[in-house]
Amino acid sequence: MSSEMEFSQKNKNSEFSEFKDMGLTGLANVGNTCFMNSTLQCISHTYELNRFLDKETYKTRLNKKHDSLILCEWDNLRKLMWSENCIISPGGFVNAMQKVARIKDRVIFTGFVQNDLTEFLSFIFDCFHNSICREVDMVISGTAQTETDELAEKCYNMMKLMYKKEYSEFLNMFYGIFVSQIKSKESSYTNILPEPFFNISVPISPKKTLLDCFDLFTSIEELGDDNKIFNEKTNKKENATKQILFWSLPDILVITLKRFLNNGRKEK
């Protein structure tokens, strides 16, 4: 381990020292809930989220949506998991999750069958967000002077549309923005589209490090042959390039590794 990595790890341990040697609680399987238990263990050890919930200010912002039941039941289960190191049966949380899933017509989470962990995580955090989302004021000022300013303006406008009516602390904590940039190789045509993201699904690079995976995810893609873009100004199809760029990252970045190919085979 390099000295930089050692220093970073020491800082991390010091920053979250109150969680040391605690939260080592197991969750009993209540019927094909391995995917759920794995997800809940990850959430349980997201210390920034724990600190936010420990303040309990979220309780003053709970709305009347059914999603609030998920957040409250999770907070109750989380406190039990951190009260002592033991084994707990998460029956109360499972019942609440299935009830809300039925109301929201998310049939896959209403029974006791295995499900995709990433999809379940997204469902849980959607419920968390919906529990305390509210309208806020957002003002964007200034005039774009450069290409970077124009990009910033598009991102801020997207954030305003996304945040103004339904803001919650979970957006800053878990949601970021990336930009899909398409550039023509035959004209000055450029299209920039900012998009919010909760989870980044990265391909596995031959070199197998996480940074290599991100390099592959953000690499330039050639758009030619059947994938040419249509330029409305020239009324022609043109060769182009496409690239994903990150504008802002969340406090906590959720990453999924694409371990399977389109044909269902597993990456080596």
Positions of PLM-derived features:
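UBL (ubiquitin/ubiquitin-like) substrate-recognition surfaces
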Residues: M1-K268
